[in-house]
Amino acid sequence: MFSYYVHLAIRSLRRNPVLTTLMVLSIAIGIGATMTTLTVFHILSGDPLPGRSRQIFIPQLDPRPDNQPGQHPFDKLDYTTAMDLRRARRADRQAVVVDSQVKLRAPETGRPALMLQMLSTDADFFPMFQVPLAYGSAWSARDDEDRARVAVISADLNDTLFGGSDSVGRSLLVRGSAVRIVGVLGRWRPSPQFYTLAGGGFAHGDTAEFYARPQDVFMPLSTSLEVNGDHFQPWTCFAKPSMPLNLPSAPCVWLQLWVQLETPAKVAGYRRFLADYAAQQKASGRIGRSDTAVLLSLPQWLDHNRVVPGDVRLQSWLALAFLGLCLFNTVGLLLAKFLRRGGEIGVRRALGASRRAIVAQCLTEAGLIGLVGGTLGWLLTLLGLWALRQQPVAYADLAHLDVWTFAGTFLMALACSVAAGLFPAFRASRIAPAMQLKTL
């Protein structure tokens, strides 16, 4: 019976190609615009560490000695707090992180010096965040302690300097200091760049830079303080620092500490440790209040920083509203089309067709329109994502169609077209056969 409905639907659509084209275009444009924006929203709001994000936590503690009730802790830690928590080693893995600019060159390539982004961190950073390595390995905890002059570089920098070949063992000059490459990252593009997130709560939706590519150079924090320490910048200072600025002793926050806690018991234990540490620091007079100590999971941290850019959220709502307008137009066109066929429907009802059969026939026709519109909408989605990749935004390279989007495009098109056809189909099924037969 379904094949018969499809045959009738195709004949009906061919009978009025202009009206059919208008309905298909209405569905296609609405689906294309909506799926383009929803694809971007889906990518930007995804889990940057699938399967592990709920084991990753970031501690916060306000170091201000004059902190007042109602003040929230900074998104970063001061040097004393970060080092105290790091030395305690209460987590399964832990890593202090701070990013900065760095000037480097590869002497053997003869290329001019480059100004790049560097992440200073600890050896646990790589296994904790499941960072893939194409060549070599990360440095060891012993390298952290020994302030070893070693580095891991990104795949992009390896392509630029060494043509993508295995560069392990080669040297870089970082601020004039020789540093040996021990590893090269594989293709790694966390979305967002969660491990440096800060300040999203007061960014007013301007968070596109949270989706920037990973840093080009990774070095032990202990080494970076020697090699590039003069070029670290404070995130914010809660008192006037002395000059020249010495960040490790300055009243400034500029570091983040990430910890991995694999069980709920370990999470509870770390929270107790953090509370005890805060109480101890308050008793010593270093901080003003101890109740600012909190431990946030990675998903909570993403929510805290409101990572999805405000313009992407707005575009998603506008696209959904536009889709609603397109569906409203489709409802009107389908209603006009079905009511125009009142004579045909009246004859079918007089010959014994049930109202359910009429509804099924009309919905099959609406579904066929949705299928064609979905195919065209999928092509428009591809075009929209291509156009987005040409834009100068940090997340432009992430805009690609995935399986979810591909399937969602057709499911949404079918669902929307069938939903748009419900009211016209119901009205068509209520046509009185006797009244239509009198007009024949």
Go through each PLM region and give its residues.
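Intracellular coupling helices
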Residues: 6-18, 328-364, 368-369, 430-439
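Transmembrane alpha-helical interface segments in multi-pass membrane proteins
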Residues: 21, 328, 344-389, 408, ...
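Short, strongly hydrophobic transmembrane alpha-helices
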Residues: 16-49
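Membrane-helix entry/capping segments
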Residues: 1-4, 10-11, 15, 19, ...
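C-terminal membrane-exit region of the final transmembrane helix in multipass inner-membrane proteins
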Residues: 408-440
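Mid-to-C-terminal secondary-structure elements
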Residues: 123-138, 149-306
